[in-house]
Amino acid sequence: MVALFCNQKLEEYHVLLHRHRPVLLAFCVLNLGFAVLATVENVLVIHALRSSSTLPGNLKKMFLSLAFSDFAVGFLGQSMLGIITAIMLKMTANGNYDLDFLCPTLITVCYSVIYFLTCVSFFSIIAIAVDRLLVIFLHLRYHELVTSKRVIFTFASLWMACGVATFIFTQLPNHQIIFVAVIEICGLLVATTAYIYIYSVIRSLTTVHPQREHQLHNHEQNRNRERKSASSAFLVYIVFLACFLPNFCCIMLLTSNRSTVSFILANHISGFLVLLNSSLNPVIYCWRYQEIRRIVKNSLKKLLFIR
């Protein structure tokens, strides 16, 4: 099964190398460039999150899970993909299209790492959306029900579940498209439903009748914190949607015909957007949270020897 999975991927690359070589070259450069960017950004964000004293504990753990998976996507996934693509481009430039040495190990390992880490990133964002929903829905009971141990257990289970899903994915090469489509649509629906509810509640809070304002005065600081956290998570979700929704659409196209060159190309483009998500998430953290932004700036100054 693993050999079949690898051969299918290799066939796709053979098609793109013959028909869309400049696009593959662009992918190679972009993947290697954003691999470095994602690695550096997420290292800085992980340090900032660990040093933060104002970010809610549960949210910090969730952001750490997301940042670590995004770091690994850049450091391992994108860099491996960029290097393998560069090898294929160099060999075929000399007229050598014998790329069988890449299977069954190299391509399988590369895509297994990518699928595993993007799966963790995908579900971490969904978990953040659900957590922001619980903050508003449970309010005062949130810390009683959503404890630190439960968050750690949930995310440990998430990482293990993504490992199992990756194994299943590589073992079902003929059904992998449907498998990924089901996972993506379920995740997109859960995250979208959560944020629709979150912002319907926030809108009602911002339009409270004047005579009721004094009743909420004592909770205003907590409410503002909740709104800021929800807004930050919502920006993560918007980027997430822009990066993952095109991939779902391309998967739907491939279900109709896996041999159409334009569909294969579109799927690789949407795959790059999925990887790009790991470079965009850290920017959102730094932009929305003043303390994290300050810690990142100080870290950069130290690295660049700027006083």
Positions of PLM-derived features:
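Seventh transmembrane helix
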Residues: V190-A191, A242, C249-M252, H268-R307
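Intrinsically disordered regulatory tails of 7TM GPCRs
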Residues: M1-V15, T54, R203-R225, Q290-R307
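Extracellular N-terminal segment of 7TM GPCRs
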Residues: M1-L44, T85, K90, I306
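Extracellular TM2-ECL1-early TM3 structural module of rhodopsin-like
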Residues: H20-L32, L59-A127
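Extracellular-loop-to-transmembrane junctions of the mid-late helices
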Residues: A161-S200
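Intracellular effector-coupling site of seven-transmembrane GPCRs
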Residues: S69, S200-N247
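Hydrophobic alpha-helical segments of membrane proteins
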Residues: V43, F75, S79, S229-L253, ...
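Class A GPCR helix-loop hinge within the 7TM core
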Residues: F116-T154
